[in-house]
Amino acid sequence: MELMVKGAAALTVSETTFGREFNEALVHQVVVAYAAGARQGTRAQKTRSEVSGGGAKPWRQKGTGRARAGTIRSPIWRSGGVTFAAKPQDHSLKVNKKMYRGALKSILSELVRQDRLIVVEDFSIEAPKTKELVAKLKELELNDVLIVTGEVDENLFLAARNLYKVDARDVAGIDPVSLVAFNKVLMTAAAVKQVEEMLA
């Protein structure tokens, strides 16, 4: 199949990478797993056995008229432990390489079908200036966009850093979440070829 390249000849690409049927269940599974893997999972609370103090019985068992109590760190008490205390946990989910690649292919194919993937011969700016990047994106009528280049472009990354709904990455930095998060994906011809090789 062929991808249209702005201001250049069409690019021949693999049908299996850019023309595959959309697998919603797979994409959902991989996106959820990717987001889950980004969770810190460091929350921690203390149970009654972990809270400092509470070793001595506050008052004797019988004869005071008060409710019986064995520790001042009971979950019922103020400053007591937490009944079902949250503990650090690993939220990451297992995703096979085949599934991950399949999801990326599915997303890229859907972007092509929805005319959300724009391919250009080259995309760079002379200086790390946000103003320059804004002007260049305005020419292409883009504002909510992920820019993917074949190699690391320091100027582009620095200029995009301060823009809302604009991100610049090299091919190694793309992931399922970033591909679905933006309205458009702008790729250089070199990046398209690299993605194709990566997912072959």
Curated annotation (Swiss-Prot):
Q: Which InterPro entries match?
A: Ribosomal_uL4, Ribosomal_uL4-like, Ribosomal_uL4_dom_sf
**Record's subunit section:** Part of the 50S ribosomal subunit.
**What family is this protein classified in?**
Belongs to the universal ribosomal protein uL4 family.
This one is known as Large ribosomal subunit protein uL4
Q: Which GO terms describe its biological process?
A: translation
Taxonomy of origin reads:
Bacteria, Pseudomonadati, Pseudomonadota, Gammaproteobacteria, Vibrionales
Q: Name one GO cellular component term.
A: ribonucleoprotein complex
Q: Where is this region: Disordered?
A: 43-65
Q: What does this protein do?
A: One of the primary rRNA binding proteins, this protein initially binds near the 5'-end of the 23S rRNA. It is important during the early stages of 50S assembly. It makes multiple contacts with different domains of the 23S rRNA in the assembled 50S subunit and ribosome. Forms part of the polypeptide exit tunnel.
Q: Name one GO molecular function term.
A: structural constituent of ribosome
Alphabetical list of Pfam families matching this protein: Ribosomal_L4
List keywords of the entry alphabetically. Answer: Ribonucleoprotein, Ribosomal protein, RNA-binding, rRNA-binding
Keyword rRNA-binding attributed: yes
Q: Which SUPFAM superfamilies match?
A: Ribosomal protein L4
